[in-house]
């Protein structure tokens, strides 16, 4: 899920969503803490275009954080047992220079399941 989809995944699985401490719509540098799968080839940092009005405050059980930033503790997460991923930022816009790599990595994850 991207942005709201990321938040809906968290809420559906029992996580907590709330208003961001710093509302912003801007370029942000994220810290990639797990560069397997979704962020393969992108660590340790990446510039992204992010929207922070609401955000995931607490991840659900069986999820792990993949990326964070100085504005948001949960920029990205994944389920530990399923191929369920969420990202707060927007990889689809040109303001996220390496966003297409995230989509390519996600496509590779999906191909392994077919």
What are these regions (language model features)?
Residues 1-41, 47, 97-105:
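Cysteine-nucleophile active-site neighborhood
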Residues 21, 67, 88-89:
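Residue-level recognition of conserved beta-strand positions in structured domain cores
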Residues 24, 50, 88:
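Short aromatic/basic micro-patch
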């Amino acid at each position: 899920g991207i942005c709201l989809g990321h938040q809906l995944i968290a809420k559906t699985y029992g996580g907590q969503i709330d208003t961001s401490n710093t509302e912003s719509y801007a370029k942000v540098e994220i810290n990639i803490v797990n560069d397997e799968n979704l962020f393969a080839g992108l660590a340790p940092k990446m510039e992204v275009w992010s929207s922070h009005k609401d955000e995931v405050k607490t991840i659900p059980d069986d999820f792990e954080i993949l990326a964070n930033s100085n504005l948001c503790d949960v920029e990205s997460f994944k389920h530990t047992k399923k191929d369920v991923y969420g990202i707060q930022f927007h990889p689809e816009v040109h303001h996220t220079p390496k966003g297409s790599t995230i989509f390519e990595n996600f496509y590779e994850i999906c191909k392994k399941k077919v």
